[in-house]
From Swiss-Prot:
Transcription factor which acts as a transcriptional repressor. May also function as a transcriptional activator. Binds to the palindromic T site 5'-TTCACACCTAGGTGTGAA-3' DNA sequence, or a half-site, which are present in the regulatory region of several genes. Required for cardiac atrioventricular canal formation. May cooperate with NKX2.5 to negatively modulate expression of NPPA/ANF in the atrioventricular canal. May play a role as a positive regulator of TGFB2 expression, perhaps acting in concert with GATA4 in the developing outflow tract myocardium. Transmembrane segments: none annotated. This is T-box transcription factor TBX2. It is found in: Nucleus. Residues 349-371, 390-408, 420-443 have a biased composition (Basic and acidic residues). SUPFAM superfamilies: p53-like transcription factors. GO terms for molecular function: DNA-binding transcription factor binding; DNA-binding transcription repressor activity, RNA polymerase II-specific; histone deacetylase binding; RNA polymerase II cis-regulatory region sequence-specific DNA binding. SMART domains: TBOX. Residues 109-287 bind DNA. Its main location: nucleus. One of its GO terms (biological process) is cellular senescence. Residues 517-601 are annotated as: Repression domain 1 (RD1). Keywords: Developmental protein, DNA-binding, Nucleus, Phosphoprotein, Transcription, Transcription regulation. The gene is TBX2.
Length: 712
């Protein structure tokens, strides 16, 4: 402390003097400049603006004391300098929030019974980084307030003790000393301030209060430590402005049954169940109720039981081909072209493929499906020849769309298969079945087409009002998801060409490369995982056993010579493998589609390098119409050419590549003139027989050189 300017040994005190008058004016200390220092003393701005008189005067301190006394008494201070005449000091009473009112607040806890249930078990409140609300919410009812006075209601949460807890042996026990306490935060009710009448009209709920363990929280949430016990507190403050809270009187109310332990995950299962049973926002976790989860569960229970019965052997490690596990209607959308989601959702698990398999599998089919995954093939989309169905079975499946189309089954141990006997049978009965069924199955023209790849001619005339690619396949479901029990519908006017379809003629191996491209090109479709396995060969065959006997120019010329405009290839097919396979299945099932079969078979010679190396558009057919009845003498492609030939040639045609005459004669591909509408069934049959001879020759070649691989 500085020595006083006038040292007097007889003085009993040493008054404090400022070093210079201008350095510390009195207004710097009093309410005129910093009212928070002296909230009870408010002077006019000009009252203490002048500095103290000469510091040598010993009466300066006395003058200051007199000024303080005068201010305390509410008197005018005239000795401190000039000031406006109306200026005066306000008394201490004038700074109180409002006049004294008589009130005696009473607070009761809402939902006390529920709080008691939680309290008996040891209430837990989950805290998260993003903040979590309390349940039960802190809700009270207030009475005894002054109706006209304004109140601020708020709450905070404080540590109940200085212990850390752990849940051990189904009970909470002390685990050590508490962690350092988090910064205190008060939660002011959003309606504050409000009159006592408004507060007493309804319960006061703090349901928006959020608990967090994020110590750097910027949202104003209450920060807590996990595994610590806390006690909520409720406060009533009579004030008409939130800014006056620091100088106001708090009335605090504590309810012991509301204490809880903060956790990051529920420890006590009984607490979890109690919250599920009572929290209206947790109805999705209940077994009974009106929530979406309950309805979904009720709908799926029967099918789940059925699925458990049929798929139990597979879950235990065995292979099961039972396929009567139909999915629940709420889980699988119907396969209508207009309402279902994107058709690219075709990647299926093994269990789903099992459910889509035939309901009465034969022993051969069982062995083939087991051998399928080992060769990188999909059992439902293979290129071999499947066993035939009897006529009643075909009729039954055609009548019931719920049974749907079973995917083409696996075609033997290799891509050619060991089914020569069945193939000969199929060839022998192909024409008879086609003639018998040409007039059958007259159904409405817009009925979904259930494709069956195992019969000679399962498609009636009414099934085929339009067999082509439509230009607006995006946004419609061409094929429904091939889930359990779902039919594979072909919508009229939308068709594709692919390898799995030629199973009835044993030509699946010719389209291995196309299958690989179609599988890999679906924009993340199913083939992304398997379509490019084994050097570009799709699920129809493995790399070690599939030759690609035709050159690239042959396939292009074949398609062009048959009147099918083939746009140049661009990388991979735009549609998943199943699009190509099932549509070509329908095409190959007709008796007079030998030209299309030859064209698509030649297209299969494309190797992986041609798909990946060229930057051209994709294989696509132009739309064309099919007459209502298909006489035996009419070819599928001739009708299409008559209906849409000009449009196809204008939009998608390309010049055919050069082709040796020998290759054309070997394949037996007819010229454009041979495809006139006057072509007879005899010519179609001869074309089909020539293709079959070619396939037989290829199979003999395959038997002679089994180790040859397809060119990379």
């Amino acid at each position: 402390m500085r020595e006083p300017a006038l040292a007097a040994s007889a003085m009993a005190y040493h008054p404090f003097h400022a070093p210079r008058p201008a350095d510390f004016p009195m207004s710097a200390f009093l309410a005129a400049a910093q009212p928070s220092f002296f909230p009870a003393l408010a002077l006019p701005p000009g009252a203490l603006a002048k500095p103290l008189p000469d510091p040598g005067l010993a009466g300066a301190a006395a003058a200051a004391a007199a000024a303080a006394a005068a201010a305390e008494a509410g008197l005018h201070v005239s000795a401190l300098g000039p000031h406006p005449p109306a200026a005066h000091l306000r008394s201490l009473k004038s700074l109180e929030p409002e006049d004294e009112v008589e009130d005696d607040p009473k607070v009761t806890l809402e939902a006390k019974e529920l709080w008691d249930q939680f309290h008996k078990l040891g209430t837990e409140m989950v805290i998260t980084k993003s903040g979590r609300r309390m349940f039960p919410p802190f809700k009270v009812r207030v009475s005894g307030l002054d109706k006209k006075a304004k109140y601020i209601l708020l709450m905070d949460i404080v540590a109940a003790d200085d212990c850390r807890y752990k849940f051990h042996n189904s009970r909470w026990m002390v685990a050590g000393k508490a962690d350092p306490e988090m910064p205190k935060r008060m939660y002011i009710h959003p309606d504050s301030p409000a009159t006592g009448e408004q507060w007493m009209a309804k319960p006061v709920a703090f349901h928006k209060l959020k608990l967090t363990n994020n110590i750097s929280d910027k949202h104003g949430f209450t920060i807590l430590n996990s595994m610590h016990k806390y006690q909520p507190r409720f406060h009533i403050v009579r004030a008409n402005d939130i800014l006056k809270l620091p100088y106001s009187t708090f009335r605090t109310y504590v309810f012991p049954e509301t204490d809880f332990i903060a956790v990051t995950a529920y420890q006590n299962d009984k607490i979890t169940q109690l919250k599920i049973d009572n929290n209206p926002f947790a109805k999705g976790f209940r077994d009974t109720g009106n929530g979406r989860r309950e309805k979904r569960k009720q709908l799926t229970l029967p099918s789940l039981r059925l699925y458990e019965e049929h798929c139990k052997p597979e879950r235990d490690g065995a292979e099961s081909d039972a396929s009567s596990c139909d999915p629940a209607p709420a889980r699988e959308p119907p396969a209508s072209p207009g309402s279902a989601p994107s058709p690219l959702r075709l990647h299926r698990t093994r269990a789903d493929e099992k459910c889509a398999a035939d309901s009465d599998p034969e022993p051969e089919r069982l062995s083939e499906e087991r051998a399928g995954p080992a060769l990188g093939r999909s059992p439902g989309l293979d290129g071999g020849s499947p066993p035939r169905l009897t006529e009643p079975e075909r009729a039954r499946e055609r009548r019931s769309p719920e049974r749907g189309k079973e995917p083409a089954e696996s075609g033997g141990d290799g891509p050619f298969g060991l089914r020569s006997l069945e193939k000969e049978r199929a060839e022998a009965r192909r024409k008879d079945d086609g003639r018998k069924e040409a007039g059958e199955g007259k159904e409405p023209g817009l009925a979904p087409l259930v494709v069956q790849t195992d019969s000679a001619s399962p498609l009636g005339a009414g099934h085929l009002p339009g067999l082509a690619f439509s230009g607006h396949l995006h946004g419609q479901q061409f094929f429904g998801p091939l889930g359990a029990g779902q039919p594979l519908f072909l919508h009229p006017g939308q068709f594709a060409m692919g390898p799995g379809a030629f199973s009835a003629m044993g030509m699946g191996h010719l389209l291995a490369s196309v299958a690989g491209g179609g599988g890999g090109g679906g924009g993340g479709g199913p083939g992304t995982a398997t379509g490019l396995d084994a050097g570009g060969l799709g699920p129809a065959a493995s790399a070690a056993s599939t030759p690609a006997p035709f050159p690239f120019h042959l396939s292009q010329h074949m398609l062009a010579s048959q009147g099918i405009p083939m746009p140049t290839f661009g990388g991979l097919f735009p549609y998943p493998y199943t699009y190509m396979a099932a549509a070509a299945a329908a095409a190959s099932a007709l008796p007079a589609t030998s030209a299309a079969a030859a064209a698509a078979a030649a297209a299969g010679s494309l190797s992986r390098s041609h798909f990946l190396g060229s930057a051209r558009p994709r294989l696509r057919f132009s739309p064309y119409q099919i007459p209502v009845t298909i006489p035996p003498s009419t070819s599928l492609l001739t009708t299409g050419l008559a209906a849409e030939g000009s449009k196809a040639a204008g939009s998608n045609s390309r010049e055919p590549s050069p082709l040796p005459e020998l290759a054309l004669r070997k394949v037996g591909a007819p010229s454009r003139g041979a495809l006139s509408p006057s072509g007879s069934a005899k010519e179609a049959a001869s074309e089909l027989q020539s293709i079959q001879r070619l396939v037989s020759g290829l199979e003999n070649q395959r038997a002679l050189s089994p180790g040859r691989e397809s060119p990379k």
